Amino acid sequence: MSQRDYYEVLGVARDASEDDIKRAYRKLALQYHPDRNPDDPEAEQKFKEAAEAYDVLRDGEKRARYDRFGHAGVGNGGGFGQGFSSNEDIFAHFSDIFGDLFGFAGAAGGRSRGPRPQAGSDLRYNLTISFRQAAKGDEVTLRLPKSVPCDECGGSGAAPGTRPETCRHCGGAGQIRQSQGFFQIAMPCPVCRGEGTVITSPCPKCKGSGQTQQVKELSVRIPAGVDTGNRLRLRGEGEPGIHGGPAGDLYVVISVEDDKTFRRQGQDLVVTREISFVQASLGDRIDVPTLDDDITLDIPAGTQSGEVFRLVDKGLPYLGHGHTGDLLVEIRVVTPTRLTKKQEELLREFALLDEEKPLEKVKKMARKIGKAMGMD
């Protein structure tokens, strides 16, 4: 009986990539798997066809022979499904593709993988810093309780002079298998808990865990401009890996204290400065604090309460951008609440001045009021 073209079976072009072939086989294997189609000979046959086609096209050498000589080039002239010696071979590729997802092993006698390397857990450290540390950057030392390999047993968990023994229940595989239809499902061994070995003489220092707790000092550079909620990732400073797996990461989560002088708006800083209504009317020069030194700010005549002056590049640096925010000086005009009799008289006289009076006369009166209030 003539055989269908392997590319046709998988529904891919002859120049299909390895990933295309794998995706096509995955789709067909799920669609026609016997467990999904019980008592359906046609579905079982299509499952075998897909497995045989994938077996050839996934292998570069077999595929080259097939492309040149057809089915004769791969030694399969007996019809689909005849290229495998047992059901184990037919299900082997299915296990390769889906095993990591579902824990499936192949049919009877499938491969034992044993315990796999596992990455260590990530750790979180909450760090509170001052506003000035956040603004200028700093280097801080963290004291971290961490699990480290036991120096008594070298991390094996076994007492010195002994070593872990192969688990007799699973034969060192770390897994036991349960049959369900065509599948064997790999389960962690309940005796060794997936380790493949058991410790008969635990290390007295770590009690067989292979790890001990130590306080580790770690120097961390805080970049200038950080804000509450920012995270610093320190690779490899988390919990150690298992079975040779990589260590996890340490995430330092920043919390910035409030400042008595400045308020923060993103990378801009806001500072409030109070002036008298005389200063607001006539203008003045006032000192304004910055992150470095005080600077002098010219207040123009007629300044209103709530007016904001922007000092460029006097704010906080942007992380990773090389730019700096601004300093916003918010003016608050203070109205006196307690006046002497003379001050009150001068204010009333000031209020009676017509708008048509010469400006110099108004300014002269304002200066006179300011002098009376001790603001000159």
Swiss-Prot record:
Protein's UniProt name: Chaperone protein DnaJ
Question: What ranges of residues constitute the CR-type zinc fingers?
Answer: 137-215
Per UniProt, subcellular location reads as:
Cytoplasm
The organism of origin for this protein: Nitratidesulfovibrio vulgaris (strain ATCC 29579 / DSM 644 / CCUG 34227 / NCIMB 8303 / VKM B-1760 / Hildenborough)
Query: What does the note accompanying the cofactor annotation read?
Result: Binds 2 Zn(2+) ions per monomer.
Q: Which residues form the J domain?
A: 5-70
Q: Give me the gene this protein comes from.
A: dnaJ
Give the matching CDD domains.
DnaJ (cd06257), DnaJ_C (cd10747), DnaJ_zf (cd10719)
A Gene Ontology annotation in the biological process aspect, one of them, is: protein refolding
